[in-house]
């Protein structure tokens, strides 16, 4: 059974997430100076920023990353700090009502938020290789990996619904 601990993101939590973003960015740059690979964009930052921008409640328990308070919809979020590409994985037991994708433009410190219009059932039909769908791989107990940018955002011409300007701490609905 899923444990839920929903939190409304107030101004203080939003500002803490923005501060954490800039600390992550600085640490990531230091690490990339001596290693090929940087640090993944922390979900504690991306999920908080998503909730602040969209009015969702952050789930600090299990069973989805957030909740839409009016409809009780379970929100799953995935994020990338690489604007051009991503590799995302989903657990075999994913269950959500709406998938949101967060795409970070590090150069300009802007986070773009996309409502993919996809739920966990829709996700199962996405072709992840020549012979299998995401659902096929989940049924085998695997964590399928694919690009949300390529297979969902670009394939369906999805535009962002919001932008977070991290330098100015502005949230803009698009």
Curated annotation (Swiss-Prot):
GO MF term set: type II site-specific deoxyribonuclease activity
EC number: 3.1.21.4
Example of a GO biological process term: DNA restriction-modification system
Disulfide bonds, paired cysteine numbers: none
Domain of life: Bacteria
Alphabetically ordered keywords of this record: Endonuclease, Hydrolase, Nuclease, Plasmid, Restriction system
Catalyzed chemical reaction(s): Endonucleolytic cleavage of DNA to give specific double-stranded fragments with terminal 5'-phosphates
Class in the EC hierarchy, top level: hydrolase
The keyword Nucleus belongs to this UniProt entry's keyword annotation: no
Name the record gives this protein: Type II restriction enzyme Bsp6I
